[in-house]
Amino acid sequence: MARFDSLADSVGHTPLIGLPKLSPSPTVRLWAKMEDRNPTGSIKDRTALSMLDAAEKSGQLQPGATILEPTSGNTGISLAMAAKVRGYRLICVMPENTSPERRELLEMWGAKIISSPAAGGSNEAVRVAKELAAQNPEWGFLYQYGNPANTAAHYNSTGPEIFEDLPTITHFVAGLGTTGTLMGAGAYLREKNPDIQVIAAEPRYGELVYGLRNIDEGFVPELYDASVLTRRFSVGAEDSVRRVRDLLEVEGIFAGISTGAILHAAIAIGNEAVREGKSADIAFIVCDGGWKYLSTGVYGANVDQATEGLDGTLWA
C-alpha cells in the first residue's frame, strides 16, 4: 500500500483497469483510467492542484488570498478542498440550477457560492466570473478554461501514467469540457507514439450531456487545440445514461454521467476496430464517481425516465 506525506501528494497515481466484459473482443480491449480514486472523487483534483501550484509559483496567489472560479461541479469541489488545506478563501460562480450535491460539497469545504442565471448555463457563469475578476483584481482568478496549468496537469501526470501502464495503447478517449485532459494527456501520448489516436467525446449538437460541451455551440475554451485530436465523436444524452448503467451492471464500476458518454465513444471506436480486423488497446477516462449523482435517479429508473429526470439541473 502506498504512503503519502499529505492528501495533496495522493492525487493521481490512479489505477488503469481492464473491462473484459464490455471490451468488443479479446484483441480489442477497453481500459478505464479510474480518476474517481482521487481524494474528492474526480479527475479535477489534478487540475486544481496544478493551477494552485502555478499561481503560487508566479506570485498570483499570496497567503490568505481569495480565489475565484466559474464552475458547475468537480473543479470547484477540488479547489475547495485544496483551498481549505492551503488557507485560501474560495468563491465559486455557479449556475443557479446546479445540483444540490455540488452546493453541499462546496459549502462543506467552506466555499462561498455566487449564483448565475440558469438559462445561460456554464457559459453565463464564466461571463459573471470574468466581470467579478475585473471588479476585484486582487482576487486570484484561476480560470480553468484558459489556464495552461490545467493542460500541464495532464501532460505531466495523466498521460505519463497511462503510457507507463499501457505502452501498447492505440486510442485515448476523454470528454470535451475544459479540454485540459484531452490537450494535455493527448499531446503527451502522441509525442510518445504519433500513431495513437486521440478522440474527444462531445454532446450531440443541441443535446445536453452533463460535464461536456459541444464547441460548435458557441464557447470554445482557450485551451482547445484541434491539432491534438484525431476526431470528435458525438454522443447523445440517452447514450450516456445507458452506458454509465452498463458500466455499473456489467463491470461493477460506479461512475458519473459524463463517463457514460466517454465509454459510448470508446465502445464505438472498438467496434470499428473489430470490423476492420484490427487489434486495439483503448484507454478512456472515468471522470468521477457515481455517488455524486444518486439523486438523479440515473441508476435506478428506466433509461427514458432517467434521461428525462436530468432535464433542468446541472449535475457535473
Describe the residue ranges of each PLM region.
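PLP-dependent amino-acid enzyme catalytic core
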Residues: 1-316
